[in-house]
From Swiss-Prot:
Natural source organism: Caldivirga maquilingensis (strain ATCC 700844 / DSM 13496 / JCM 10307 / IC-167)
Keyword Cytoplasm: no
Start-end of Low complexity biased regions: 14-30
Function: Protein S19 forms a complex with S13 that binds strongly to the 16S ribosomal RNA.
Keywords on record: Ribonucleoprotein, Ribosomal protein, RNA-binding, rRNA-binding
GO cellular component: cytosolic small ribosomal subunit
Top-rank taxon, per record: Archaea
Protein's name in the database: Small ribosomal subunit protein uS19
Gene Ontology biological process: ribosomal small subunit assembly; translation
Length: 187
């Protein structure tokens, strides 16, 4: 038999401890918690966007975000992984072109101070540098999930950030669900 090493064992935070910490937070944070709790019931949790101050530290394959924005598309394609590079070299499908038109239109409206939502079913669109800064609503089969695009998303697919399945948390089996409960009288 092996002996367990003696020493302090760090305790994992319990649900009660996290609830107490959440209760101690200011009221503004409580409103955010409420919306994320509602989102959790619907199967997704809103990601926290990365502040724009940290975007200056971003590099993609050695290029800064500003260099990526100025780069022509054919040079940017050479930086992508093989799967994404092959997809873009074949050309964009009509749904991809429509999405890019919507994005350009939304950026033009954002420059004027207005905002229009960009909704799409096109989950296989590769995130390009011109999409950065927008929140794109991606369809997951049930609802549209808001995906705030930051430089760290470049080169990934939109569908990676809008999960289509929920984690199933099974309850207890009901009456007659197992052989041991077949002969129990129903109330």
């Amino acid at each position: 038999m092996s002996k367990k090493p003696e020493g302090k064992v760090e305790a994992k935070p319990t649900a009660k401890a996290t609830e107490a910490a959440a209760a101690a937070a200011p009221a503004a944070a409580g409103a955010e918690e409420e919306s994320s709790a509602e989102a959790g019931r619907r199967g997704w949790i809103m990601p926290t966007p990365i502040p724009q101050e940290e975007w200056k530290n971003f590099k993609y394959r050695g290029f800064t975000f500003d260099e990526l924005m100025k780069m022509p598309m054919n040079e940017f394609i050479k930086l992508l992984p093989a799967r994404q590079r092959r997809t873009l070299k074949r050309g964009l499908r009509p749904c991809h072109r429509q999405l890019l038109e919507k994005i350009r239109k939304a950026k033009a409206f954002a420059a004027k101070g207005k905002s229009i939502p960009v909704r799409t079913h096109c989950r296989d669109m590769i995130i390009l540098p011109e999409m950065v800064g927008l929140t794109i609503f991606v369809y997951n089969g049930i609802t549209y999930i808001p995906v705030p695009i930051s430089p760290w998303h470049i080169g990934h697919y939109l569908g990676e950030f809008a999960i289509t399945t929920k984690i199933v948390q099974h309850g207890e089996p009901g009456l007659k669900a197992t052989k041991s409960t077949l002969h129990i009288a129903a109330k």
